[in-house]
Amino acid sequence: MRKVTIVFHDAGGGHRNAAEALKTVLEEQDYPWQVKLLNLQELLAPIDFAAKATGLRFQDGYNLLLRKGWTRITPQLLVLLRYTIRLHHGRIVRLLQKHWSEHSTHLVLSVIPHFNRCLAESIRKEMPGAAFVTLLTDLADYPPGFWMVRESEYIVCGSELAKQQALSMGHPRRRIFETSGMVLKPSFYRKPEIDRRQERLRLGLRPDLPTGIVMFGGHGSAAMLEIAKRVDRSPNRLQLIFLCGHNAALAEKLRALHMTKPSRIEGFTSEVPYFMSLADFFIGKPGPGSISEALQFGLPVIVEQNSRTMPQERYNGKWVTEKRVGLVVPDFSGIEPVLGQMLKPSTFEELRRNVVHYKNHAIYEVPSILDHVMTSKAMESWQTSSTWNSVDPFAGAAWAGLT
């Protein structure tokens, strides 16, 4: 049985979501693969510089920035993070090598940025026969060294720009794979069969009003308060569903506003697809996951693009504009006129039409890509072997689909 290890961390929710979604689908497919998840942050806990300096783990500090909306300082923090990773590169590689020596695998799939040079070197040193795949969970890279590095072996990207970035770095075309979008949980492909009218009524909403869903990832954002206040005093006829994630304090502050417009405020929920099925449009952060989830449910989006936008997400607003699947606002303090524009029948119909035409099946495209990679890696190992007998190129015939 072939072993696949998916490397993730919990800085932001998107990396874990991608890892768990891929594990679920890979195990459902007809491949004899054993799939394991590796939380890199736990493995690197002995050298977590942030925890040693502040008592706060790196991933917790990052998530705190998201909750507080302190994202304006992320470019400076990225410089510090890159420097720290370079400083500890040798120790990180050794910890990874130790892990691989105890938990060997045939393919390593990274769904995280920053650490891919360390991962590539540790695999080359400890498991030279293993394949190393980097799957971007962003629509584009933020060079240098964010997602793609010279040492990257195989790259899976979800946009034409990311593919061109990989090619411009000199990566061979045969090792670059473009999917139709971002990896989403399988649940986003199984839309709930519900009576929207009855469900809206049950949640205290009106069945006849345009309904927006407001989301800022798994930890919410203070920007949701600004949106609630602005929308509540706007002349636009609509209602909102707020999903606050793990930010219970934010949910309480929203409830304390006592909005005059109908609203529903939820804390953390695993029923995001259910709430999206009740909505007509999306308002939130320009994260690749949030945008892609909304589009999967046919929702045009309104996202913010300014100096507070995290560097790796700055292309996303441009992507939304180019695809004509939503509107971009410079600041949510100006959301009222943008909402008015979106709710014009002609504008909404055009955006909705473009959203419906956008098809993303990335989660179901990745298994065949990985199967191809493992087949290619096995053949390369055979071709570069010093003797014909050192590697059996057909040892994996069953998993490779060879006959």
Model regions and ranges:
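Conserved N-terminal ligand/cofactor-binding loop architecture of enzyme catalytic domains
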Residues: A21, V25-H103
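Donor-nucleotide binding loops and adjacent catalytic segments primarily
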Residues: I194-L201, L205-L278
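Acidic donor-binding loop of glycosyltransferase active sites
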Residues: S277-S290
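C-terminal "capping" alpha-helix adjacent to the active site of nucleotide-linked donor transferases
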Residues: T321-R324, P330-T347
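Active-site and donor-binding regions of nucleotide-sugar-utilizing enzymes
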Residues: A18, K68-H171, R175-E178
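C-terminal amphipathic helix plus adjacent low-complexity
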Residues: S346-T403
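A nucleotide-sugar donor-handling region in carbohydrate enzymes
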Residues: E153-T211, F216-G217
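Short hydrophobic beta-strand element within catalytic cores of glycosyltransferases
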Residues: F282-G284, P300-M310
